[in-house]
């Protein structure tokens, strides 16, 4: 392999590892094997609890109005 070909392969490897690291959903903690916490909102349960409406401002429960 020539020098130009080796440089091209090197750039492709660097690009591939960069793309993989940015597209994975892991945070910096996952490198140590710790899970990254996520928040999942159950909208059915949230509709039953008016105090939950304050946390979820962009969701409107059907037939309900958020507190003022």
Swiss-Prot record:
Localization annotation: Secreted
Keywords carried by this UniProt record: Disulfide bond, Secreted, Signal
GO cellular component terms, A-Z: extracellular region
Tree of life domain: Eukaryota
Tissues of expression: Expressed by the venom duct.
Disulphide bridges: 46-52, 47-61
Signal peptide: 1-21
Keyword Iron found: no
Keyword S-adenosyl-L-methionine belongs to the record: no
Residues that make up the propeptide removed upon maturation: 22-44
General remark: Both the globular (with C1-C3; C2-C4 disulfide pattern) and ribbon (C1-C4; C2-C3) isomers shows no activity on muscle-type alpha-1-beta-1-delta-epsilon/CHRNA1-CHRNB1-CHRND-CHRNE nAChRs, alpha-3-beta-2/CHRNA3-CHRNB2, alpha-3-beta-4/CHRNA3-CHRNB4, alpha-4-beta-2/CHRNA4-CHRNB2, alpha-7/CHRNA7, and alpha-9-alpha-10/CHRNA9-CHRNA10.
Notes concerning its domains: The cysteine framework is I (CC-C-C). Alpha4/8 pattern.
Function per UniProt: Does not show activity on all the human nAChR subtypes studied.
Protein family according to the UniProt entry: Belongs to the conotoxin A superfamily.
Protein name listed in UniProt: Conotoxin G1.9
């Amino acid at each position: 392999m020539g020098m130009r070909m080796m440089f091209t392969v090197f750039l492709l490897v660097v690009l591939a590892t960069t793309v993989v690291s940015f597209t994975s959903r892991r945070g910096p903690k996952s490198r140590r094997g710790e899970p990254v916490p996520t928040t999942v909102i159950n909208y059915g349960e949230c509709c039953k609890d008016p105090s939950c409406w304050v946390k979820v401002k962009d969701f409107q429960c059907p037939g309900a109005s958020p507190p003022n």
